[in-house]
């Protein structure tokens, strides 16, 4: 049921959805089942099956938690509330290296014959490794201080955050192209009236 799925998402803490989005999507939820017999669905399914197979067959020696903690420290230290170009570039390289090491050296116990919590966590951390790199790439692209994020190169002489509405009055949407470093930026301009 939809209620059970919603509870699973909340319990899993994998999805964050602002309250206002529910109303926005309400009409779309009632559109009925979406057909999955398109080639894109089959390709996505094959990619996931291959990823699961590779994770389970990998004979690494490091836990998923090992990688999760390292990624968290990279994001916290180099892509947190206060950011600068040097550390963002370092974060991107470190995350790329961490992701490569993850796929080479992670150990995921169990099988895919039934629900496997370590496998689910490994898949989640694999997503976080991609999202973390894209997060740093997006922060590197946006060279202004805005909202709760302080770009050290974009501040007044008094040390206050300095916005750049001339160049950054847009919403960023990144198109997945395979790996985060090749993601394509799409800008949706904002106009306030």
Residue ranges and their predicted role:
Residues 4-7, 11-193:
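Glycine- and aromatic-enriched mobile tails/lids
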């Amino acid at each position: 049921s939809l209620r059970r799925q919603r509870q699973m998402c909340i319990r899993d803490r994998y999805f964050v959805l602002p309250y206002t989005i529910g109303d926005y999507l309400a009409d779309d939820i009632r559109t009925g089942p979406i057909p999955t017999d398109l080639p894109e669905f089959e390709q996505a399914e094959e990619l996931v099956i291959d990823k699961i197979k590779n994770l389970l067959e990998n004979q690494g020696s490091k836990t998923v938690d090992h990688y999760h903690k390292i990624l968290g420290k990279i994001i916290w230290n180099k892509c947190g509330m206060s950011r600068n170009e040097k550390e963002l570039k370092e974060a991107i390289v470190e995350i790329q290296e961490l992701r490569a090491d993850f796929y080479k050296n992670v150990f995921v116990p169990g099988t895919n014959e039934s629900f496997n919590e370590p496998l689910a966590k490994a898949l989640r951390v694999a997503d976080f490794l991609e999202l973390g790199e894209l997060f740093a790439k997006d922060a590197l692209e946006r060279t202004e201080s805005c909202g709760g994020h302080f770009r050290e190169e974009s501040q007044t002489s008094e040390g206050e955050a300095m916005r750049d509405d001339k160049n950054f009055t847009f919403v960023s949407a990144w198109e997945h192209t395979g790996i985060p470093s090749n993601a394509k930026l799409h800008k949706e301009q904002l106009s306030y009236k």
